[in-house]
Amino acid sequence: MARILNVEIPNNKRVIISLTYVYGIGRSLSKQILAEANIDENIRVKDLSEEDLTKIRNIASRFTTEGDLRREIQLNIKRLMEIKSYRGIRHRKGLPVRGQVTQKNARTRKGPRKTVAGKKGK
């Protein structure tokens, strides 16, 4: 298995797909990296030369990926919560952040239903 940005990428898959195993590199960024390195995107990782892998590593290292990207996202969310913006408050309460309706749905974000005991015998 080849190692790019401290991530083992699978040998038997196409390069464009294998690069997406790195957090922060999707299909479009993968395509961009391969175009800049002049490498065919349909070639398998096991067929790449060490020189090609070095090119990919050098180009990919310029982007924010893996731990740095995760840390940056966490700091952005933390900043939103500290300045008490609407989005920060929604993050803090564990509710949907992007304007979704929560009256009936949003179970993924809210978690399982919390049943409230009703009054017995009216």
Swiss-Prot record:
InterPro entries: Rbsml_uS13_C (IPR027437), Ribosomal_uS13 (IPR001892), Ribosomal_uS13-like_H2TH (IPR010979), Ribosomal_uS13_bac-type (IPR019980), Ribosomal_uS13_CS (IPR018269). One of its GO terms (biological process) is translation. Residues 106-122 have a biased composition (Basic residues). PROSITE patterns: RIBOSOMAL_S13_1, RIBOSOMAL_S13_2. Transmembrane segments: none annotated. One of its GO terms (molecular function) is tRNA binding. GO terms for cellular component: cytosol; small ribosomal subunit. Residues 94-122 are annotated as: Disordered. SUPFAM superfamilies: S13-like H2TH domain. It holds the Pfam family Ribosomal_S13. Keywords: Ribonucleoprotein, Ribosomal protein, RNA-binding, rRNA-binding, tRNA-binding. Belongs to the universal ribosomal protein uS13 family. Located at the top of the head of the 30S subunit, it contacts several helices of the 16S rRNA. In the 70S ribosome it contacts the 23S rRNA (bridge B1a) and protein L5 of the 50S subunit (bridge B1b), connecting the 2 subunits; these bridges are implicated in subunit movement. Contacts the tRNAs in the A and P-sites. Part of the 30S ribosomal subunit. Forms a loose heterodimer with protein S19. Forms two bridges to the 50S subunit in the 70S ribosome. HAMAP family: Ribosomal_uS13. PANTHER family: 30S RIBOSOMAL PROTEIN S13/40S RIBOSOMAL PROTEIN S18 (PTHR10871), SMALL RIBOSOMAL SUBUNIT PROTEIN US13M (PTHR10871:SF1). This is Small ribosomal subunit protein uS13. The gene is rpsM.
